Amino acid sequence: MNSMNNWLGFSLSPHDQNHHRTDVDSSTTRTAVDVAGGYCFDLAAPSDESSAVQTSFLSPFGVTLEAFTRDNNSHSRDWDINGGACNNINNNEQNGPKLENFLGRTTTIYNTNETVVDGNGDCGGGDGGGGGSLGLSMIKTWLSNHSVANANHQDNGNGARGLSLSMNSSTSDSNNYNNNDDVVQEKTIVDVVETTPKKTIESFGQRTSIYRGVTRHRWTGRYEAHLWDNSCKREGQTRKGRQVYLGGYDKEEKAARAYDLAALKYWGTTTTTNFPLSEYEKEVEEMKHMTRQEYVASLRRKSSGFSRGASIYRGVTRHHQHGRWQARIGRVAGNKDLYLGTFGTQEEAAEAYDIAAIKFRGLSAVTNFDMNRYNVKAILESPSLPIGSSAKRLKDVNNPVPAMMISNNVSESANNVSGWQNTAFQHHQGMDLSLLQQQQERYVGYYNGGNLSTESTRVCFKQEEEQQHFLRNSPSHMTNVDHHSSTSDDSVTVCGNVVSYGGYQGFAIPVGTSVNYDPFTAAEIAYNARNHYYYAQHQQQQQIQQSPGGDFPVAISNNHSSNMYFHGEGGGEGAPTFSVWNDT
């Protein structure tokens, strides 16, 4: 099929009815005149017919169709645009079928006269008739966009020059032409590629570390440890499983050791490690009490690339605003985290996490500190989450620190108009009465005439640094004394031993002050200012008695006895001591 390459030409101009073919001598030039075209590429024909040059050419827009009869050596091109359409044709025309022969029309006139041809190859139209202009502006634009380098190339033995359309299959000449175009285009593409800077791809598909399971991050430069968990691999799946991130490390060796520990946890001691198994004996024993996820999480927390605000303790994070430490435990409230509170130190937050872990996960819980540090039984039996001191194991259970021991004096004298209220507080624990510290100084003062002054009344408080510290840290520094009317003089002992007579009107004294109510005689009672803290109460049962006069303030017991003594006319002893406790 490639060898059958003849041209089939036809004219785009109006056709005549005359249809003939004539073979002429080589000395006679065949002239083909377009009888209707008056313009050839916007060139007007001369108006004088006598001087008109009859130029032999095929129609200016001759579109040829190959009839598959041309040999392989013929020159053909796709959309061949020949600029010499109006050139002088001196070669013999190759006889071939024309489209006009099939359509029954002709556009050629044969003349035996000599033909005058312009040196530039311009053609003169023999007739100035209209109808030859077919969008010349559009054709000129098309020609300018599709010009061919070899415009003067002529086909061998082919006198037809014009706009040619090749409809043949691929020939050797056209293949050569196309190959040349491909070479030019390929060369251009290569030039563009060579001028473009090449982007180097580092370590793609290559090992970036000599250790197993370690890769170097291209951007950060840190070494990351990864492990492929094939336990979640489904049947028929070609992937290695799920990639487990073990943390980022500054040193390559640390990342390799993290991989070794994770591999030992996942696959046992038979797996391949970067370092000898003898170096991980301690870690192998520790990881037996942890799940895979928990152990991987512990490895991540120890890595240098752990998240911002992380703590070395499990379940502890730092708040990004106020900087306090928060404790959370996961997977206990459905699939969400349970917030445990905010704490001042990491250790407190870590203890809160440990207590919650023991509560929700029992004895198999993974804690930050040793489980013997906590009262596990109390935590497990508690209906709520006992975060705080109540969940800790108290080493000195027999030595709790109570808040305060207070005792009062009750007047049993017949001359007593207003007496003390006998008040008692009972605590749930009964322990021996003991004294923490003794005061060496005695404080003397007295009350006279109902007014305190530097002249008639002298209240002497010898302030020491320890006493001031105690008073500042006491829950209450002052106790009010109610106003009471009395028909006799009162004797009030403040901070020591006092002999005084006067009408009592009432005033405020510090907590821990010993008060002796004696209407007739004086009493000397030893007092120590810091006998405030005791471990237990002395009496298990105490009565609350109300005297007709009203209530008097309570006072702290001295260091010599468990009771406050009252000295009056009838003589007698006051009420037993009592204590006030709190759970702090």
UniProtKB/Swiss-Prot annotation:
Keywords: Developmental protein, DNA-binding, Nucleus, Repeat, Transcription, Transcription regulation
Other comments on record: Was named 'Baby boom' because overexpressing transgenic plants exhibit several spontaneous somatic embryos.
Annotated organism of origin: Arabidopsis thaliana (Mouse-ear cress)
Residue ranges of DNA binding: 210-276, 312-370
Tissue specificity: Mostly expressed in developing seeds. Also expressed in roots, seedlings, and siliques, and, at low levels, in leaves.
Known partners and oligomeric status: Interacts with HDG1, HDG2, HDG3, HDG10, ANL2, ATML1, PDF2, HDG11 and HDG12.
Disulfide links within the chain: none
Gene designation: BBM
Region (Disordered): 150-180
Function recorded in the entry: Transcription factor that, in opposition to HDG1, promotes cell proliferation and morphogenesis via transcriptional activation of meristem and cell proliferation genes, but prevents differentiation, especially during embryogenesis. Binds to the promoter and triggers the expression of epidermally expressed genes such as GSO1, GSO2, ACR4 and WER, and of HD-ZIP homeobox genes including PDF2, HDG1, HDG5, HDG7, HDG8, HDG11, ANL2, PDF2 and ATML1.
Protein name: AP2-like ethylene-responsive transcription factor BBM
Domain of life: Eukaryota
Pfam families referenced in this protein's UniProt entry, alphabetically: AP2
